[in-house]
């Protein structure tokens, strides 16, 4: 590993060069005339042709080779599988192909005892993270080891994939992992500082996007590491003022995604996107308030105090709670409708405990029936009986989770959505660190450096 290979070198070197550059004609010829060459490995790191094909994203050659090799989990010098290298380099087609033929997603390397999921999260390949997690749900791992256990699998320093993603400033991976059941408040043994949570590591790296996402999933700002430090102290120690401002225990609590609610986990993609965008907007408002007048003010999506489309809709389409936003969410089976912002206020009036698996679902503010399902509202101007309008304006009592009559008619932000941080979808991601290429060690040279990738 770490040495470029020329087609003019020895035959076993030439086969690796052919794989690397995608010369499928040569590979077919070798398979027909000199198949023993396919059993060769590179001189130092002992990469097989499967490793080289996977790392270089040569999906056609990889597929061809997998027809010959009965074992897709060949090991190199560091006990890394082809699937690990595909995940490391973000070769999504190779990741999917290897998973399809039964590559073991539960193999551990000998460098840091990491799996392919650790590699994908560490290097920021969210699509590979998702593909591996999808494979885990349908593989024997889910049956014999447990899907939740796999998502939160630890390396030899006690780091889960979520810890690595947060430390390496990978907000998209953080989002996928949290959405798949990663424990937001899990502590490391020795990775980073002993006892670090993902929030400690995001604070240390200064990734405000990761901080936002973790807070939105209920990360505890007051949880301490083994040295007694809360994430705020870690952020300020490393001079990440914007992160520190959001993590300051004296600042307003963020609005938290109500993941413990069963109907939230069952949302279809369209309804989930609407609610996530509402959460993003609410927490952006909270950020603007916290950072106002500081040197850390951040750009936020621009929007006016009144919706541009207000003049184009009839009163019957407006949310009967805030009278400001168009109804976009419908409660099944009663059919009552609300805007996404008021729906979140109803579901999130209490911050969920990340360790709680079940909570009492909220009730519809109009008919008091228990909410079991939320879908995107299908507004129809000609069907006024579905509007479920009220004679009085109703407001959500966030403390009691109740609804009462009132003359309240404020902007949606007055429903205290802005009290509480985290954009969810559509946020710009922090640029990844430059990759350090080495001569094949595959190790982490220091705590604050990227793991060396092999040059293949």
UniProtKB/Swiss-Prot annotation:
Residues making up the signal peptide according to the UniProt record: none
GO BP annotations, alphabetical order: protein ubiquitination; response to heat
Biological function: No E3 ubiquitin-protein ligase activity observed when associated with the E2 enzyme UBC8 in vitro.
Pfam families, A to Z: Ank, Ank_2, RING_XB3-XBAT31
UniProt name for this protein: Putative E3 ubiquitin-protein ligase XBAT31
UniProt keyword Protein transport present: no
GO MF annotation, one: zinc ion binding
Key words, A-Z: ANK repeat, Metal-binding, Repeat, Transferase, Ubl conjugation pathway, Zinc, Zinc-finger
InterPro entries linked: Ankyrin_rpt, Ankyrin_rpt-contain_sf, RING_XB3-like, Znf_RING
ANK repeats: 45-74, 78-107, 112-141, 157-186, 194-224
PROSITE patterns per record: ANK_REP_REGION, ANK_REPEAT, ZF_RING_2
EC id: 2.3.2.27
Catalytic activity, reaction form: S-ubiquitinyl-[E2 ubiquitin-conjugating enzyme]-L-cysteine + [acceptor protein]-L-lysine = [E2 ubiquitin-conjugating enzyme]-L-cysteine + N(6)-ubiquitinyl-[acceptor protein]-L-lysine
Pathway annotation: Protein modification; protein ubiquitination
Gene label: XBAT31
RING-type Zn finger ranges: 319-368
Disulfide-bonded cysteines: none
EC class: transferase
